[in-house]
């Protein structure tokens, strides 16, 4: 299970504030609200906003660290969702890597990642290949899990040192290629494991 970044008392106060605010502005009674964890919310909007109801659908979420977790696998079947795997933010840190590279490239983390993604296609293979190899040495897919080859003590300083002197577009291109390959390999493994080929995805990493 994931780690909580707030105490139980903090979470209780936050929920009370949310309910009170919505009651005051919309007039919906508080007893009609049901709180769900971050990845359940991601999975729900991905599945229930999709056209898939008959048969089984894989519902995959990937993001930074919502409620202490960074990825989940669920199965949607006949309008119902069942969580079958959760991955902690300590084990899946692709979003954090993307965040740090955004910062290293002089942009605003948690806001300008889309600019890094937009910059990536401008780099040709001979430009991004060195950066790509740096990222490949970090995390890899092992079945349905993500693992570090050799976990750096500090990801930001690790990449700052390893990527020094490389072109900015090459860094963006290498990062995007690495992330796409990593996630595609994981998705293929999930499909192979459960035999379900219909997929919906949600979360910041798959945006």
Where are these regions (language model features)?
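Short acidic-aromatic active-site loops that bind/stabilize oxyanions
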Residues: 7-12, 33-36, 165-181
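Conserved phosphate-binding catalytic cores of ATP/NTP-utilizing and phosphoryl-transfer enzymes
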Residues: 35-59
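Phosphate/ATP-binding catalytic cores across multiple sugar-kinase/actin-like superfamilies
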Residues: 173-197
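A short helix-loop
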Residues: 54-58, 62-169, 173
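Glycine-rich phosphate-binding loops at beta-strand->alpha-helix junctions
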Residues: 198-207
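Glycine-rich phosphate-binding loop and adjoining helix at the ATP-binding site
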Residues: 2-44
């Amino acid at each position: 299970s994931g780690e909580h970044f707030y105490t139980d008392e903090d979470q209780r106060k936050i929920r009370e504030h949310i309910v009170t605010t919505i009651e005051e502005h919309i007039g919906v009674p508080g007893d009609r609200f049901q709180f769900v964890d971050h990845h359940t919310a991601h999975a729900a909007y991905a599945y229930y906003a999709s056209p898939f109801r008959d048969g089984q659908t894989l519902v995959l979420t990937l993001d930074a660290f919502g409620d202490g977790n960074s990825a989940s696998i669920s199965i949607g079947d006949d309008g119902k969702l069942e969580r079958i795997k959760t991955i902690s933010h300590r084990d899946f840190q692709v979003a954090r890597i993307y965040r740090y590279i955004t910062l290293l490239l002089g942009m605003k983390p948690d806001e300008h990642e889309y600019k890094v993604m937009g910059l990536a296609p401008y780099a040709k293979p001979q430009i991004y290949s060195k950066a790509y190899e740096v990222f490949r040495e970090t995390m890899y897919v092992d079945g349905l899990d993500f693992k570090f080859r050799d976990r750096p003590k500090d990801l930001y300083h690790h990449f700052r040192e390893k990527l020094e002197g490389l072109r900015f577009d090459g860094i963006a291109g290498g990062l995007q290629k690495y992330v796409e390959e990593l996630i595609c390999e994981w998705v293929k493994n999930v499909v192979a494991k459960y035999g379900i080929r219909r997929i919906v995805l949600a979360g910041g990493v798959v945006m």
